[in-house]
Amino acid sequence: MKKYVSLVLCLLLAALLFTGCAGGNGGSSGGGKTSDAAVNEALLGCFGKSADEAVKALGLKDDQKAGDYGYTLDYAWGGQTMDTNCATNSGGAGVFGYAEAQKTFENSDAGTAEIKAFVEKFTAQFNDPYAVTRYTQAEKTKETYDAAQLETYLKDVAGGESGSGVQFRFSLVGKNDRMSDDGDYIEVSVQNTGDGLRVKLSMEHVNR
């Protein structure tokens, strides 16, 4: 019963967000959307708005702009639960969005191929069409994303000791102006658990 009520609330929330936020913002082009993509589009529809517009679209009061207010919606994506948040932030400076997905893969070449697809699918739903660049915390450099380089990282972790890992970021660049400023990124964290490769993906967007 509790799960049923939660599902109904999530559906109502998605409908509210789609009506209040998505209108007036063009969605990504392409074929038919999955229900997950439709929910995500409703949330991302708030990102192109100013803080004042977002507060109105989210049904918030003017005095709520000073804090973090908004909605968090859990829904299934690719067999995983993703937590997506749309809210005003930093004293009403803009709209903040965050999404996360996590999954464990086999510690093998087949596993690394599946991880590449997992990363690219996650990235594509936020920026379509999209291009990504890779940031590494150690090098402090920015370079064009190369799927072969990602595979090299994954194989290094797979061949390492249990507990070893790697973490890096993709900045989002593309025609979708809601997701094209420098503050947008997807972070990839891969850890060798000994039993497999645990991959955690997160997306963050701030529209100021």
What are these regions (language model features)?
Residues 40, 51-58, 112-119, 123:
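Extracytoplasmic/secreted envelope proteins and their assembly/folding machinery
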Residues 59, 101-106, 144, 148-208:
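An acidic-aromatic pocket/loop used at catalytic or ligand-binding sites
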Residues 37-44, 106-109:
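Short, recurring structural edge motifs at helix starts
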Residues 45-49:
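A glycine-biased structural micro-motif
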Residues 16-20:
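C-terminal motif of bacterial Sec signal peptides marking the signal peptidase cleavage site
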Residues 1-7:
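Positively charged n-region of N-terminal signal peptides that target proteins for export
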Residues 77-168:
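Long, charged/polar, surface-exposed segments that mediate recognition or autoinhibition
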Residues 22-25:
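Bacterial signal peptide processing site
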